[in-house]
Amino acid sequence: VKRSERNRARILASDGVMELTVHVRNANRPRQPVRDVRLDYSKRWQHQHWGALVASYRSSPYFDFYAGRFEPFYRREWEFLADYNLGLLEVLCSLAGVPMPELSRTYVEAAPGDLDLRPKRKEGPALIAEPYFQVFSERMPFVPNLSFADLLFAEGPASVSVLGRCRQG
């Protein structure tokens, strides 16, 4: 999980990109299934994240409209990273007006000798972002590949149509 996208989000702060990291226990365990990753609250990351979101986005056009749906993720103590991520995904899908992806209820272990031929790391971004007005646009150029919250706080109900204008990289 260490250095994984499963527990990170990028937002735009007044001095540039800020990476928010959800702290987890035993981050260095290799090949730990995400369903078994437990959250670590010893570092007060929830307080830091919520403070960063408020400081960065309170002047965004839609922050006040959506903030109440995000705040519970920074008040409640979730046990597992997977539950936290799924809960947040449900809220994001709901706010964006898109259906929640259907997820499997069971995990099928790969058979011994099965080859995973998918590339391990893709080169460059899969999509080229459609620029939109960001909270600090008057001070810095457009910053792509941020959290969906950045787009949602800036564009509100138009967020999905902005995503639809992205093109293949």
What is each of the regions a protein language model found here?
Residues V1-G169:
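Residues lining hydrophobic/aromatic ligand-binding pockets adjacent to catalytic sites
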